[in-house]
Curated annotation (Swiss-Prot):
Assembly, per entry: Monomer.
Record protein name field: Endonuclease 3
EC number(s) on file: 3.1.30.1
Positions of a divalent metal cation 3 binding: 25, 30, 146
Co-factor note (free text): Binds 3 divalent metal cations. Can use Mn(2+) with a lower efficiency than Zn(2+) ions.
Presence of the UniProt keyword Lipid metabolism in the record: no
The species this protein was found in: Arabidopsis thaliana (Mouse-ear cress)
Binding sites annotated in the UniProt record for a divalent metal cation 1: 69, 84, 142, 146
Amino acid sequence: MGWSLRMWIVSILVLTQLVNGALCWGDAGHYAVCKIAQSYFEEDTVVAVKKLLPESANGELAAVCSWPDEIKKLPQWRWTSALHFADTPDYKCNYEYSRDCPKDWCVTGAIFNYTNQLMSTSENSQSIVHYNLTEALMFLSHYMGDIHQPLHEGFIGDLGGNKIKVHWYNQETNLHRVWDDMIIESALETYYNSSLPRMIHELQAKLKNGWSNDVPSWESCQLNQTACPNPYASESIDLACKYAYRNATAGTTLGDYYFVSRLPVVEKRLAQGGIRLAGTLNRIFSAKRKLARA
C-alpha cells in the first residue's frame, strides 16, 4: 500500500471519529492543538508545511496530527510507543531530563530529535542522512500535543494514571483516559453542542483576549533555542500533581466538581500546545534563520 493511500485511510478514520464523537486527546485534542497552531504560522511556515504534508491532508496539518497514535500499535511502528510520554518518579512531582528520558527515549527527546530533522532543511549540511521530513513534521506536531497532557508526564508506578481505575460519572474507565478523552468529550457535549470547531473557536477567542498577554512567553524559547520541551514537561507533572491525581484515587467516582474544576486546565494546555507548536515550526522554517545559516 503506497504512502498516499495509507495516509488517506488514516485521515478518513480520524475524520470519522471526529464526526461520530469518538473524541480524545488522541484525535480531538491533537486536532485542536494543530488547528490552533496553523492560525499562528508565519508565511514561510505555511509554505514549508504545505510542501511536507501528504496530499491526503489537503493542506491541513490538523488532519494528520493523530497519525502517530494511529500507527504506534503496528509491528513496524511499535518502537515509537515510548516516545509519547516521559514517566516521572512517584510523588516527586518534578521532571528531570537526565533521569526521566533515558537515552533520549521519551516525548521530550522525540521533540528534540524531530526538530533537528526538520532543521536539516534549513542548513547547508553535507550529511548523508536523509530524513523523511513528512513523518518528522507529523511526529513533532503530535508529540507537542502529548507533552501538554499532564498525565503524559505522570507517575511511573501507575503508568501515568492508566492503572488508576475510576468512574467518570457512571462509566468505568481509568484516570489517564479521563484526561485524554473524557474531559474534552464532556465539554463538547455540555458547552459546544458536540462541535469541535466551536470549541476551537472559543479557545482561539481566549488567546486573543484572556490569554493574549501570555502568548509571547508561551511561544518563546530561552537561550535562542529552536525547541524547548523540558519546561513543558515540568509544567505537566506539576499540573498532574495539583489537578489530575488530586481527589482521584482508585475507585473514585469523578463527576461535576472534578469536570468543572479541571476543564480550564485542559483548555489552557490545548491552547499552549498550539501556540508552542506554531512557535517551534516558525523558528524551524524562518527565512531569517535560513539566511543566517547560509
